[in-house]
Amino acid sequence: MADTGEPYAAARREVIKEHAAASSCGPPSGSKVLLWINGPCGAGKKTTASELHRRLPGSVVCAPGAVGLAMHRMLPPSARSSWQDIPAWRHSVLELLRLTLAGHDGPVIAPGTLVDDGHFQEIIGRLRDEGVEAHHVALPAEPATVVRRLRARSLGLEPRTQLWEVTLLDGWLEQLRRPEFATHIHTDHKTVAQVADVIAQAAGLTITPSIDGPVRAWLHRYATTIRHIRWA
């Protein structure tokens, strides 16, 4: 825990400065870049998005799940299911991404689950047709890995709000393995930093190197987990 403080901050500032000066740092000026990180709940979408955001200067995270959670809070438990099947969710996410891309010059990172090809085309396909440089990656993992992560997110409990996610897990993973949802990055045996590196390489973006030690990397993951605990 002695690596915190000014030496660490100074090192990160130097790394960011060097990469900002590099001519190969990201897409041409003026292009609109979207990174959609797909996968079932518990695959590591949000932690990966957070890692990319920290290491990709000028990026912003636009989380489609926040729209779905708001809709779920308006519905009785008996009516809750996968929000990607709700037309209002898909329309809202598309419009919010359009607004974010129009108002922000840097890459937009969107961690969200899409397992239906029609829904995929309705959001990502539409944005591509409109000229957005939309990159998509899927983060499949073994069911046992996903369930373990969901339990960790809920502090070891079996939260009622995630029961529907577990029941849909096998179907989601089967869908995401299809070639239509490439690029596939299996996360079972990769660190979050390694997954972020692969995504950046696939999208042709240069991110700052990870200089986190194991403790700091764990703290970042834990902080992201705490922020996304679902209490109701």
Predicted features by range, described:
Residues 37:
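Hydrophobic anchor at the beta1->P-loop junction of P-loop NTPases
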Residues 44:
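Conserved glycine(s) of the Walker
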Residues 84-138:
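Glycine-rich phosphate-binding loop used to anchor ATP phosphates in small-molecule kinases
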Residues 40:
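P-loop (Walker A) phosphate-binding loop of NTP-binding proteins
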Residues 47-95:
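Conserved substrate/cofactor phosphate-moiety recognition/catalytic segment
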Residues 155-198, 205-232:
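Small-molecule kinase domains that catalyze NTP-dependent phosphoryl transfer to phosphate-bearing small molecules
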Residues 1-25:
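C-terminal alpha-helical interaction appendages
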Residues 130-151, 185:
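Conserved phosphate-donor/acceptor-positioning beta-strand/loop module used by diverse small-molecule
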